Amino acid sequence: MNHATSELHDESAVTSIPETTRLQDLKALVKMGIVNSNTLTVFTGFWLALHFNGLSVMDNLDKLFFTIVGSGLVMAGVCCLNNYIDRDIDPLMERTKTRPTVTGKYKPGFALTFGLVILLLGFVFLLLTTPMAVLMGFIGAFTYVVLYSLWTKRKYTLNTVVGSISGAVPPLIGWAAIDPSLGHPIAWMLFLIMFIWQIPHFLALAMKRVDEYRNAGIPMLPVVHGFEITKRQIMIWTVCLLPLPFYMSGLGITFMVIATLLNIGWIVLGFYGFRKKDDIKWSVQMFVYSLNYLTILFVSMIVVTFF
């Protein structure tokens, strides 16, 4: 980018900064939406660990508090650090150009320091549960910040797979807070569901935002290999979810039916993409379905334990 272009970009960025409150800026800095959605999976892991170990939530309210707050701080911390790392490419993408590290609402130094502080504070809270919960939190943070944000995101199309490891860790944090052995197979089914789910979820988003990723120089699969290969990959990973509910028979037949219907619905919608001419519209439908899928699936896991 030459000097004149840089000045023009800076001037445009300044004049288009949206009016936001300090609280809104803080929520954007820590990516509160991501923190909230992952908190559901943390709680599900915690709840199911209680259920399968015959423990009462009322006897473990302190651990529940430390787990939710600790994991939330860890996730907020790594999201802060991601904003710090991506501050040079975020202005190039429509969905990220209003982040506070781009608009100047928060300076890079603050984002870095604040991210590290709340990350460490999160580890302290998790340590009040079990060391294994801290280890799971560290694995998730290291994978997201180092292996994904710093290494693979800008170099390899496998960045989505690598990033999915960190996103699959939250339910293990919740489980480890109660049962540090992580010996129950359902704990690892939660990990696998989250790991596999994220890949078609984010590939659908990458199709929707393909021009933005291309402009930012991020080698997402649809940018490098096009929509047809991306759709095939989405289908492969979606089909991989199909057998997982049958390894979770401990949650009962009702859950297995709900999960299987959700999987079949996603697969059918996926196959529809090979007949649909509007790939972008289809990718939006797949993305929205994935969000509803995850919410219904994890809420169902909790609800069925009451019956």
Curated annotation (Swiss-Prot):
TM region positions: 32-52, 65-85, 108-128, 131-151, 158-178, 186-206, 251-271, 287-307
EC number(s) stated in the UniProt entry for this protein: 2.5.1.141
GO terms for cellular component: plasma membrane
GO BP annotation list: heme O biosynthetic process
GO molecular function: protoheme IX farnesyltransferase activity
Matches recorded under Gene3D superfamilies: UbiA prenyltransferase
Pfam families in UniProt: UbiA
Bilayer topology annotation: Multi-pass membrane protein
Entry keyword set: Cell membrane, Heme biosynthesis, Membrane, Transferase, Transmembrane, Transmembrane helix
Localization terms from the record: Cell membrane
Catalytic activity, as annotated: heme b + (2E,6E)-farnesyl diphosphate + H2O = Fe(II)-heme o + diphosphate
Note: Carbon 2 of the heme B porphyrin ring is defined according to the Fischer nomenclature.
UniProt family annotation: Belongs to the UbiA prenyltransferase family. Protoheme IX farnesyltransferase subfamily.
Function: Converts heme B (protoheme IX) to heme O by substitution of the vinyl group on carbon 2 of heme B porphyrin ring with a hydroxyethyl farnesyl side group.
Protein name: Protoheme IX farnesyltransferase
Lineage: Bacteria, Bacillati, Bacillota, Bacilli, Bacillales
Gene coding for it: ctaB
